[in-house]
């Protein structure tokens, strides 16, 4: 166990360049590639044609404002709070619906943003 602890300590002290070189050396010595499993998994998922598992693995979502509704002022205020945009930018986004309000967020955050927009009187979708 003491040897393993020393190995962990040595690996922790490596710079990024040293770690990359170590990775290359180990790939050559063991005859493996760190990128191969990722490529194989992507090809296998695409070849199977199963759309449902691909959706289950989705981790980033976009919140789309589909309609501002009758109460645009509240929606603009909410868009400003969510995005940090200025008044003019938020107004342009709301009036230009359908537009993405927030992109690449977690499922929970997307649901929260959608609820806030709907509470303000807008219609929104999570994609």
Swiss-Prot record:
Keyword Ribonucleoprotein recorded = yes
Gene source species: Rhizobium etli (strain CIAT 652)
Q: Which PANTHER family match?
A: 39S RIBOSOMAL PROTEIN L12, LARGE RIBOSOMAL SUBUNIT PROTEIN BL12M
Molecular function GO labels: mRNA binding; structural constituent of ribosome
Gene Ontology cellular-component annotations: cytosolic large ribosomal subunit
Query: What does the UniProt keyword field contain?
Result: Ribonucleoprotein, Ribosomal protein
The protein's name is Large ribosomal subunit protein bL12
> How is this protein organized at the quaternary level?
Homodimer. Part of the ribosomal stalk of the 50S ribosomal subunit. Forms a multimeric L10(L12)X complex, where L10 forms an elongated spine to which 2 to 4 L12 dimers bind in a sequential fashion. Binds GTP-bound translation factors.
Query: What are the BP-aspect GO terms?
Result: translation
Q: Which Pfam families match?
A: Ribosomal_L12, Ribosomal_L12_N
* Disulphide bonds in the chain: none
Family the entry assigns: Belongs to the bacterial ribosomal protein bL12 family.
What's this protein's function? Forms part of the ribosomal stalk which helps the ribosome interact with GTP-bound translation factors. Is thus essential for accurate translation.
